[in-house]
Amino acid sequence: MSLYLTLKAIHVIAVVSWMVGLLYLPRLFVYHVENNNEQTSKVFKIMEKRLMKIIMNPAMIITWITGLSIWWILGLETIFSLWLSLKFILVFALSGYHGFLSKCLKDFELDRNDRSSKFFRFINEIPTIILIIVVFLVIFKPA
């Protein structure tokens, strides 16, 4: 089995894991806002923190490491291809979104969240839209 294919498989697994977290955490925030009594708030805080620390953060790091490693193997000049440049921009956007969710998580931990469940429902669509675009870029690889 080649290093390239191994990295590619790990990359796909990491991306799927990261996307699961990016889609699920805002949904947890929705439920947290809508059921914010002291007892359920404690449970949501534990769930949210574990999702971020155990799944999302490692998956994002592995996604970046394997993605950059694959790029290195394919040749750094491939960055000049349109599809890869756009993919990098979108992965940076997902990383920024991840950072924003980390800030929201901190707000919940400190009981200072002031965002509505409607807000979290709305932003929950962001990673889905980016995922759709990235999949089309990877499959069709526009020049």
What are these model-derived regions, one by one?
Residues M1-A143:
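Polytopic transmembrane helical bundles with strong interfacial aromatic enrichment
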